[in-house]
């Protein structure tokens, strides 16, 4: 009994032990530990090819650890001493092995830009029929394309670039993917191993540089270990909370020829699970699930707060709706969670946070129980932490509510907000396990009466157009949402970063998962266009629209010709107010209208589009808008539509820094008129 208890406790300890990704001797443990934190069925996982030598998982995983194993047979001893060897790579260069490994990982698209240090790989994939290759104009574009592809397809985005500046140019996309939990595998060229540390031409310590913005990174030291490192990269990128990984490929490694067979287990994708530890984890998690169900059944004013984690599993949105319907719980989502819950459902509260719906913010502040699913309580959602969820904190102190956190990444639990119950592991899987324990609720009349009152009192509002006035950007979004959805096609929207991003989140009607692709955690301007190209590659039959602002679009506008070259019929909408709108909004509110370097000179976007092979459209007047929007979405190839919109239009509601979620600035026409007069006075009529 003592031995059994000890083994069990050891398994539980191992289950939740944090293993540093940078600890090279623990590389095999990293991949294993990642699998402990999530289910064996996850939406982002690449489908492995079946092993031909023996079943997976190995039979030994099902053996009781206390049971004395039978004496191995002579054949078993021989197999143990002589592991299965893969001869299929013998005689191939590292570049050719890379090509084959992409096939084994079911990669169908690679985004990249060639260069000297990575030429052995590019030579090997010349005319390759194993995957589609998309060439950007800049390596940053390749990274954001891979992000858009991953978000739309559920598969990891793959990037292949050269050393030095080629590698450093993908640091921003990796940091972006790391912040938003997007699976991405980046392969970078490197100078030959003999030249490392000599300041050779285009040498950069990309492993060191990318350490803080990847889940894991590695430099491949020999051609023999190349297949293993590629397999580890895909496994780690798609396990637990998805994210970017980097594999650095020295030129002599990719040019080298493999002379001897290597173990088969290093050349085939692995899907083995440690069943002993999984059983120990399941027991611990079920205790948390039971406690969570008890609190949900007790709650009077619960709210579901849902992030992008619910989208990591194909069944996530379905189970979310089932829980909401079963217990009559209203649902609010983060920016990245938009689309996971149908906004036309009366239980939808829309988005919460700094520029979220006032109803959602008020509901969170007044809820006695907050059920966080696949969300991480970032600062744009919580506002001032000391003022966050006061009613839930009061209910927690009285033992009748609080905060429940369904989260796959242990580091996100209790990082920002103290939770009463943490359910660690794949959020969707654990929701499924909890469902039968939730009591059906017919109605929550008092709670929804209050919510519906807030909805009527605080709708998204803005100063609408008057005859002859400039077009309001919010109007463009609302009209485009209807026109696009009326086509009957599957619609995907990407955005850049700025006011246009928030207006898209607020005024588009989000009904389906994986239809809103944007940069949330890092807030990367220029994200929209390349992400749209990647999404279109992943979903060629979908209507893909990039809603962009002029300042954000300027960051990566060179990718217009990439859209043409890739044959992607993306639709690019530019809301042109000739300013860095989100920054000028803050300058108006908090810096007495001192617009320091926030107005840029734009190119002629229509001539630019036409020069790069796209159709260009422009709208200046209100009466032109409807017809141009219809022409925009019905155009067969790539098209750019520029709409000249009103300037100095604020995104509201807004929760200012240091404020609680219920202390928002809401639209007031009289206040806006006063602000306009004050702005004219302070800027001498210039703005």
Swiss-Prot record:
It comes from the Eukaryota. It comes from Saccharomyces cerevisiae (strain ATCC 204508 / S288c) (Baker's yeast). Homodimer. The acetolactate synthase complex contains the catalytic subunit ILV2 and the regulatory small subunit ILV6. Signal peptide: none annotated. Residues 43-52 have a biased composition (Low complexity). The keyword Mitochondrion applies. GO terms for cellular component: acetolactate synthase complex; mitochondrion. The regulatory subunit ILV6 stimulates enzymatic activity seven- to tenfold and confers sensitivity to inhibition by valine and activation by ATP. Optimum pH is 7-7.5. GO terms for biological process: branched-chain amino acid biosynthetic process; isoleucine biosynthetic process; L-valine biosynthetic process. Residues 43-68 are annotated as: Disordered. Thiamine diphosphate binds at residue 139. Mg(2+) binds at residues 550, 577, 579. Residues 499-579 are annotated as: Thiamine pyrophosphate binding. One of its GO terms (molecular function) is magnesium ion binding. Residues 1-90 form a transit peptide. This is Acetolactate synthase catalytic subunit, mitochondrial. FAD binds at residues 241, 355-376, 407-426. It is an enzyme of class 2 (transferase). Keywords: Amino-acid biosynthesis, Branched-chain amino acid biosynthesis, Magnesium, Metal-binding, Mitochondrion, Thiamine pyrophosphate, Transferase, Transit peptide. Belongs to the TPP enzyme family. Its EC number is 2.2.1.6.
